Amino acid sequence: MPSLESADKLSNKLAAIGNITSDGRPILGLDCEHLLEMVLEADERGVLIPAHIWTPWFSLFGSKSGFDALEDCFGSLSSHIFALETGLSSDPDMNRLWSALDRYALVSNSDAHSGENLGREANLFEGTPSYDGIFDA
């Protein structure tokens, strides 16, 4: 979110729906299109980047997600998705084999869930260290 105020606004909306403090992974009973709608209502400059898109079960492209395409997940708001976070279940070369991902910026992160892979992937930005600077990079 572009500001602390808009982040608080979104946080309050999400807290009214479900548990956002459980263990770092909010438990919400809403679909992805509605979540993105809430992000954009909190601030029109807000961004949602689907994360861990290749996690095998319930990720965007997981076998249990029910989605065959990003558009199935985000519906009429799909055009607001410009980047995807690949997660540790893939690698950059694998991601570029699927041409449907060519129109998205791909970001990769490592996290404490997989200690042996910590730091395996990272994002490097050149430019001003600010919210807008990320998008200008």
Predicted regions and their residues:
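Charged catalytic cores and adjacent phosphate/nucleic-acid-binding surfaces used
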Residues: 1-23, 37, 56-137
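Divalent metal-dependent hydrolysis catalytic cores, especially in the metallo-beta-lactamase
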Residues: 16, 47-49
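Active-site acidic/histidine clusters and adjacent loop/turn architecture
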Residues: 36-43
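Residue-level detector of structured alpha->beta connecting loops
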Residues: 43-44, 103
